[in-house]
Amino acid sequence: MSIERTLSIIKPDAVAKNVVGQIVARFEQAGLKVIAARMQQLSRTDAERFYAVHKERPFFKDLVDFMVSGPVFVQVLEGESAIQKNRDLMGATDPKKAAPGTIRADFADSIDANAVHGSDAPETAAVEVAFFFPEINIHSR
């Protein structure tokens, strides 16, 4: 096992429901540490840049529109196997297919408004963390 860092975004739907604290508590209860965090309103340009990998997909415009529809809570999580642990806690992308007790099963409304984003691999985690948090703003604890 190795200590990893991963990016977690609590999306506009979950922020609007006022469940940020409940979601962060789940990460902490699973042994993940929040080592950087902030609430922010994404600009359209930032959302398009962050999700550029999906630019040619039919859902790209709707995804960007959703991500700029309200503030997001962006955080870096650190811990043993943080990437997989975060993905397990989030559950399936489609909340209808998410296991009971996962974040998406409990807080998401649809495959589009699915409460959270998490990095899917070490390489993407490094890129995604750097997108939101220059190294100077990350503090292991």
Swiss-Prot record:
GO CC aspect terms: cytoplasm
UniProt catalytic activity: a 2'-deoxyribonucleoside 5'-diphosphate + ATP = a 2'-deoxyribonucleoside 5'-triphosphate + ADP; a ribonucleoside 5'-diphosphate + ATP = a ribonucleoside 5'-triphosphate + ADP
Signal peptide (UniProt feature, chain positions): none
Keywords: ATP-binding, Cytoplasm, Kinase, Magnesium, Metal-binding, Nucleotide metabolism, Nucleotide-binding, Phosphoprotein, Transferase
EC number: 2.7.4.6
Function, in words: Major role in the synthesis of nucleoside triphosphates other than ATP. The ATP gamma phosphate is transferred to the NDP beta phosphate via a ping-pong mechanism, using a phosphorylated active-site intermediate.
Subunit structure: Homotetramer.
Family: Belongs to the NDK family.
Name of the protein in question: Nucleoside diphosphate kinase
